[in-house]
């Protein structure tokens, strides 16, 4: 039966508590009675539970108070009323509703037009109504109000009749609670959802109809007469008033109530209920209850307090039923982990033991010996005390309550418990004395001594409690301090004294040695002296001391050596004794463990005590007496050292510190005199500051006793004492009036000194009580915020409430080896809180200036406010000064004075000496001034000061005139007319002076007069003296009026504002502490802006890289959160060091991390806690109630219906849940990795993700500051750039590994053509196109041609498809631009492309390219690649000349130009069939020109005989070209079996186009029938993923031709002959290129000496240099658009010296961002995930993981060329790839031996898979074919469309397509071939082109590629010059608009202008260049 009944009861667990307002139904069902209480006598009814005056509970029948939980009742109110606590919330919620239709009000329109009036409101009559909360006679209610300006319509309130009453004919109308109740009931569900989304939840409880009556047990007992058992509760009196009012209202009614009577009843009811709830919600009534009831409190133990005692025991008291409290004394002979308990306590407190078959005999013996008090059987307890009858036989299952015995575990605590070690688990021994005894070594962790301190002892009962106590509180588990990491047990003064005395004896006789050896852990060794002349054998002190060592101990230190437990070396110095013992103990702990360490203490402590008791020690008054000569020396020191400073004591806080240091020096001198005494030297720890202070006070002097700063007594008391001192001593004492006491206790104090000392002593007493309020509040706040911060099992530090990561690792950088201190589950938040509060308490308890400043610094950081407060610290700025290397002395001091003089404001009153008014006769005045004034004011100024400050009288006159004139123009000022009539003048030498003085004759003078309309002299005199003169005195004549003060201070490394100078190491330096006037600061950041603005003229003296605002919050505003974090850590560390020996850095870092984890600096106060919980989305009302008023907290939670998940420590403990800390922390076992998604091998870069979601709202927050542009250059240099490791070539940041150059899968380096180069992208000039430097060169897998820019403010240099036309030109540099001669090692073979300056009218297109050098002038009439022209139409001999026609040369007469190398996109104005002009990459869908060519045709396409597909034939579908030499843009042949043909420069979207390679197309190699994964990336194979560009023979850019982008290599390991134009970065840097490659636009060229540091720069167009051949690199050329620099332009947050693309400088505080890190949004083939349909998602999920794994396997970093892949990868490739290949059997051959990834035999810049058969045969195979075949078989109906979409290169965006269509000539569509798919691999490549002769396929020799005659050059130049004029005329309009943007965006150094004549000359005279300069 029992089993059945128990099985029916299901286990439950509280998972959360939801708060809400109690509804009427809930109040009724909680009541024990179904009927309401309607008589006052029922308020103390027996149905409401115990306690009662007599009888039992009528509801549950209980008779004992602790058995009855109490029962509720309720009072029914006669009229509904508003809940007094929620009227405001109800008002806010109803304000959102239309009171007629109860829908959410629509937001008001901004235009205010007719449409808004008609459509903007739902109900016209209710739209104008507003709701206000009113209060009258103590009653609150809601009131409806119409606008007073509106016309009052009759019946405007009639719509409210549906809710209650039709009432009201005025502009206002009360809204009754009854009506609101009906409104809340009728709110539709849709409106409820919208209100809930806005944070307002409609609840029935907003209206009160039923008032709960609490149980009897919840009455707060405030008074008792000693007899009655019912407690008197003031809230019960108020509740009776409520009930009386209810009865009165009900009895007064007659019939139905109308609106007015309803309103009156509700107001009366509201008042009494509100009063009741106010009293009910407070712990004590405001008035004196004892006097009110005439009852005095009598202490009794009656049952009336049973419930109260229970509540206090459970929730308030630290004591419990199993605890005791007693005074402690010391016993050095007991073990450290033992505690002695008096037998009286041990007999009364019991431990529970359950009887079992195993312990029955043991417990029976205890019962028989009368050691048990009682036993329990079932629910009955039986006593076993003396006198009980009979013999008790124990049975299994009974519970025995035995007394405390020796060996029991208890834990001890001494309040206040401010740190972990205040709780210590100890073993019990029972003794006969009356105090609790502990080992003196335990005083340190308990912060106790033996002067009467009391401790609490707790006796854990259950087995789990005992186990927890031993694991958490045992001494051996707590030997290391959680605060400092040092040992918590320290030898006391008596032990050290005994040790010093022992060491002086050297030898011990036999009796002494044997007596002391009894306490050692080892046996007594043989004596050192067998026999002496005077005595027997003798042992050395070392032999006795080493008896305490563990066996076989070996350790050493600087001052001791122990080997084999033999003490071989020991420093006898008195001062070193304590530290040596600590070092030995630490060594034992590290070598032997905590158990042996405790054993050492247990042996050494009694041994030393025994020695001291036997030897004895004495101290006499003679030891404290100093000679008169020594006293005179000390007094003279006081007069010489201290007296000169006391006069300045009250000037600044730093003077106090200097005074304290001076007193400390004098103390040291006095202590040295005193330590001559042998006894004092042994007794005193001379390294202890407190010990020395006490000794000096006894025999030397008391020092500073009174101070007017940071004390609890007032400044008036100090001044009164000073007056008393002067009156008593006159001028004898120069320091006594400042609180310096020269006397000492030994010689006695005089009355004044005694008075000063008593004030100081009393202040210490007050400080220890009242002063602890502030640090106590800080400790409470720290605990509230940090209580839930623990280390989780994964090593991260998290907040258990929200599972938010606060810190990724804890203590990883610790050099002290404290990792063992903090394991998983450790509540490190609590440890950090206690570690910080301990120094805070110390700082407040100690009243020294040092401690005061420490506490102030702690508060500045830990209690920083959420919002800007405009305090003094918020307005302070610390200015550092620049280094001066001139070699002169005092440069920094002079600079500091210069800046201070510039900032410090000097008002006229600072220089004024005297003020005189002169009366002159009328004619004299008129002659001089031309006015009618008789009175003339003179302000005489200090000439010396004016000269020192370099202020002229003219400056003074001008400033005074300005102020007087401005005051005279103000309106509504009484004195305005007076200032208008005031005249000013100045003179260097005043003629009017005081007759009594002669020195005033040469005084500068400011003269002013008042031109009165009436001759009233009194009125004139009053205006001069009381109106004009005060204003003149306040006028600032020098400096900045916005600056309050500017002080030069000494800043050292131990100061909180220290910023290290990386270029100079010094102990300190002079800085300026500037404070801004409060009136000048309106918002956060103003102080910094004002100071920088004031310092513009001296900014060259200021180190802006290190200058910071003083406030941590302001540091965050200016420099960002990371800088604020570092400052918080630094300042907290400095403040702690002032008062404590040190706190572990882990604690301070955790504090700072918790303050900044929300994204802003939040202090440990209520505001910071609220902001933190909001940011982390934590709803924890119970925890919040510990920090904020609990009632308000719960009311707010009820309004918002918050749910406390009880995941916090407070919530868990409150509801009996296990807390998630320590071993109780939760974890889960994951059995299946696939279900949890942990089998995904792909790693996600957290920084990429953060950059993807980064906000740009504060993008331009820094531009608004005055003077910002001036400091940009300084700040740009300050930006942290990576420092490259010379060995590895990788960028290294000093403080993080955030920016690692990892080209992960999905993010390879590539050309980022579409990147926005704006601030918001975080890009800077030194990095790739649009690649954020922080990504270390990571780029998109494909070129982002179609990607729209993320930021529309400014477009990138090459944003070919951006939405805005960029209007800012790029910097046109003189070296390395297109067409500018570059330098190479082989200068003779380097072509010179159009070396010419930029023309003045050069057109800068929207993509910001260099204009004068870029293939001639660009035609930007269509403004982008989307339109007809890209670049220029023609250029004069651009890039040299070719055989027949140069690029862009256009034959106007013949559209069919025959040439060996057709013009590069040559264009004829009259024939659209001719290709585009030079550089006109033009219409993407444009029909190819019918140009016949024999050579490589750049950009020309021929339907019959063409070099290749034109450069601009980007979207041709199937151009059947018959090419002789492969053109630059040639396309693959139709239906070729290629995986990827040689991608032409623009062949983007071709679907199996036909291409026939000719000899030496740009970037093309010979195509043979071989299988490659990727073809050669010719001319910018823009969409290939890992294209390793290697040109074929004589390709464009080959080293033989000294092409762009390649450097001449002498190394045999060079991987490419030439990096083709646009060859993208390989991940392993396999392509080598020169620095001058076409495309390294924004990067400076490294010099030879910078080769190691710069060669790893990732550039999208310039192929990378190879690491292994870097030492053989030739001199590199200047890059395109940038002059060569001598420093690397590495990635980072600054420009690194490279020119930015728009002339903007790098703004350091911005975090970098890049769109390249959006890899999770794209597939492995760079297609957008959202572009696939739901049906295609199945195919995508099938093929995408395979593709990503393949990318990783084929990555060069995975397997070097030719290496076999691993077995796992081999299995993957065989099963997933080769198994589906259409030619599987052929590829497998005789069997697979292994699979490799290697370079293709033909296309050596491509990597592909090779299968090596067992017979040694090696064949390549294509994964594309395999995947296509697999998809076609598995999804035959969907595969083809999916393959086209998945493997297709990114297409242009819609805008581009539309523009292309517009640009297509008529008839173009008809000529376009149909779409055909094309492969994307290098496998089974079969060319279907016509056969070519060897001469056609043979590569051209260098001479063929270069040799040209001057005549050819001349003819080409002429043809180009003809088209040049057309190009200029077309682009003229554009140049005008762009010239404005140039002037705005570029600095003068970046803008180079040329005259039109220069431009024309360039266009017409290209023939003047040498042939070598015009070769291609």
From Swiss-Prot:
- Which CDD domains does its entry note? RNAP_IV_NRPD1_C (cd02737), RNAP_IV_RPD1_N (cd10506)
Which compartment or compartments is the protein found in?
Nucleus, Nucleolus
Q: Where does the protein principally reside?
A: nucleus
Residues where Mg(2+) binds = 449, 451, 453
What are the alphabetically sorted keywords of the record?
A: DNA-directed RNA polymerase, Magnesium, Metal-binding, Nucleotidyltransferase, Nucleus, Repeat, Transcription, Transcription regulation, Transferase, Zinc
According to its UniProt record, the EC number is 2.7.7.6
Polar residues bias: start-end ranges:
1332-1348, 1491-1501, 1869-1878
* Coiled-coil portions: none
Mark out the compositionally biased spans (Basic and acidic residues).
1281-1291, 1298-1307, 1349-1371, 1415-1430, 1648-1678
Ranges for the region named Disordered are: 1272-1291, 1298-1718, 1847-1976
Q: Where is this region: 18 X 2 AA repeats of [WG]-[GW] repeats?
A: 1215-1693
- Return the sequence repeat spans: 1215-1216, 1329-1330, 1378-1379, 1415-1416, 1430-1431, 1439-1440, 1447-1448, 1464-1465, 1498-1499, 1528-1529, 1545-1546, 1562-1563, 1596-1597, 1604-1605, 1621-1622, 1638-1639, 1641-1642, 1680-1681, 1692-1693
Q: Which family does it belong to?
A: Belongs to the RNA polymerase beta' chain family.
Supply the name of the protein: DNA-directed RNA polymerase V subunit 1
